[in-house]
Amino acid sequence: MNEILQVHSLSKSFGAIQVANNLSFSVNEGEILGIIGPNGAGKTTLFGMLSGHINPSNGQILFQGEDISGSPTHERARKGIARTYQIPRPFGQMTVFDNLRVAAIFAGGLSGLDATEWIERTLATTGLSRFSDSLAGKLPLLVRKRHELARALAMRPKLLLIDEVSAGLTEQEVTEFIEIVKRIRNMGVTIIWIEHVIRTMVSATDRLMALAEGEVLAIGLPKTVIDLPEVKRVYLGN
């Protein structure tokens, strides 16, 4: 199986505070890799380094065999890396459709009819077709989270970084979100998904990586990882 992403000895410190320490792992094409860890484990910092928003102090990031460690965010987006945010950041006075158009044109490299067709497919995939003409700033929570996912998908990513989309959702809404994510994977998109809800990660991912204090604690099959004593200790204490 081909590896789309390789991370080698990635570290980040802010002054004297080490938030990521010697992270090394790889992601296979077409898989959903889940990431869990308590607050302060370094999950969001890792996403920042992968997407280009945060420069690592040390280490290397290879995307499809190319070293992107020093590449800016917009170049990584053009190469096929997109991410969502815990707090959605749409253009509130623009429609759902127009938000996706911005992503499809400026990051996805599409224009004209090609952009329109891709946006319509993205809306259908994420269950947002009927909200196409709604103002993004007026959407309810569930729809807002789907819209955040749709904006990232509109960029035509090869690798999609999903950051805690299930917070505040009901169990049924989380189940629906998992189905959407799996549909996106079936479109050929590789996914790395950060989430606090362990049950979601076990049911949605192919492999699971546990972080603690900026280090990789374990990586493997989801049920195997969550049953490890060291992972239980991080979440439940001694």
Predicted features and spans:
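Glycine-rich phosphate-binding loops of nucleotide-dependent enzymes
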Residues: N2-N238
